[in-house]
């Protein structure tokens, strides 16, 4: 019988942003092969773990209504995969829209795993077997464990960190539509696309990086836009802002990101677009590694 977590733990679960997403094939088991440059935002959900005799789950916050309850919740599914995990009462403050292409549910599952491992040091978050089991819950979960800028290959399990990646100032927009990842994959016309070229060297500045990103793709965007035309409206709104350097969809959508030269420009764009589209979820952010912020805090 496992004991409750010995302390209160709070974990930040940052949004995951696919700066690029090349779909390069499909395995016989149906999983798609990816080649993606991923960064993490300084906006996200917050998961709190408190001692309990049985697993408990409560969701609060502005996006709580759309989160599934009970056994279908990814937080509880991830916790159940950790052998002998201490019991906890989870409180998830849900700030990210669900089914939005920015890894919200996967980030929450990874946060639960990190929190439980921090509360019981004999559990290793880098255990390969456990990470493999987490992958069965979602291809984004392993990358969300580390929260570092990385090149992601395979089906999501091959993670190559990108050192000294420059901070990118961005605006995230979701048009308040949920998109099914399996539906987008099903709608794709081409699954065997070219992989990414080499990522620019560490000495690359932001201007050169944006130029390189402009030459890359999100191979899921066309299919996602066919299913949800609002994605095209979001991208056009971002591209129409005078300061936007690049706009693209993240993941399977419907969230898009726009890159801006400075934090001030991103904040101004967020204000302008929020005024023009008050029904959308819009956040200014900085993209890069969030590994330090994602470290669980014990109290």
Curated annotation (Swiss-Prot):
InterPro entries: GHMP_kinase_C_dom, GHMP_kinase_C_sf, GHMP_kinase_N_dom, IspE, Ribosomal_Su5_D2-typ_SF, Ribsml_uS5_D2-typ_fold_subgr
EC number: 2.7.1.148
Catalytic activity line of the entry: 4-CDP-2-C-methyl-D-erythritol + ATP = 4-CDP-2-C-methyl-D-erythritol 2-phosphate + ADP + H(+)
Record flagged with keyword Magnesium: no
Gene Ontology MF terms: 4-(cytidine 5'-diphospho)-2-C-methyl-D-erythritol kinase activity; ATP binding
Domain of life: Bacteria
Record's keyword terms, sorted: ATP-binding, Isoprene biosynthesis, Kinase, Nucleotide-binding, Transferase
S-S pairs: none
One GO biological process term: isopentenyl diphosphate biosynthetic process, methylerythritol 4-phosphate pathway
Name this polypeptide is given: 4-diphosphocytidyl-2-C-methyl-D-erythritol kinase
Species this chain originates from: Roseobacter denitrificans (strain ATCC 33942 / OCh 114) (Erythrobacter sp. (strain OCh 114))
């Amino acid at each position: 019988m496992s004991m409750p977590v010995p302390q209160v733990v709070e974990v930040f679960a940052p949004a995951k942003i696919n700066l690029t997403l090349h779909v390069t094939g499909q395995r016989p088991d149906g999983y798609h092969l990816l080649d993606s440059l991923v960064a993490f935002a300084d906006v996200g959900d917050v998961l709190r773990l408190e001692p309990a005799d049985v697993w408990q789950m409560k969701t609060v916050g502005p996006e709580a209504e759309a989160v599934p309850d009970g056994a279908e919740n990814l937080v509880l599914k991830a916790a159940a995969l950790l052998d002998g995990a201490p019991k906890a009462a989870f409180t998830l403050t849900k700030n990210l829209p669900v089914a939005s292409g920015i890894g919200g549910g996967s980030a929450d599952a990874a946060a639960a795993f990190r929190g439980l491992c921090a509360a019981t040091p004999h559990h290793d978050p880098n255990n390969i077997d456990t990470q493999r089991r987490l992958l069965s819950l979602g291809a984004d979960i392993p990358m969300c464990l580390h929260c570092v800028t990385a090149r992601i290959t395979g089906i999501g399990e091959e993670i190559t960190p990108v050192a000294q990646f420059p901070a990118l100032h961005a605006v995230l927009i979701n048009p308040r539509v949920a998109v099914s990842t399996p539906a987008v994959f099903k709608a794709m016309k081409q699954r065997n696309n070219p992989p990414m070229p080499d990522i620019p060297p560490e000495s690359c500045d932001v201007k050169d990086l944006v130029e390189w990103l402009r030459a890359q793709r999100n191979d899921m965007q066309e299919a996602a836009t066919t299913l949800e035309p609002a994605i095209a409206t979001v991208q056009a709104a971002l591209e129409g802002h005078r300061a936007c350097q690049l706009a693209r969809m993240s993941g399977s959508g419907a969230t898009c990101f726009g890159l801006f030269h400075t934090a001030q420009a991103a904040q101004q764009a967020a204000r302008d677009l929020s005024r023009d589209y008050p029904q959308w979820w819009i956040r200014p952010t900085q993209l890069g590694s969030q590994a330090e912020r994602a470290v669980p805090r014990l109290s």
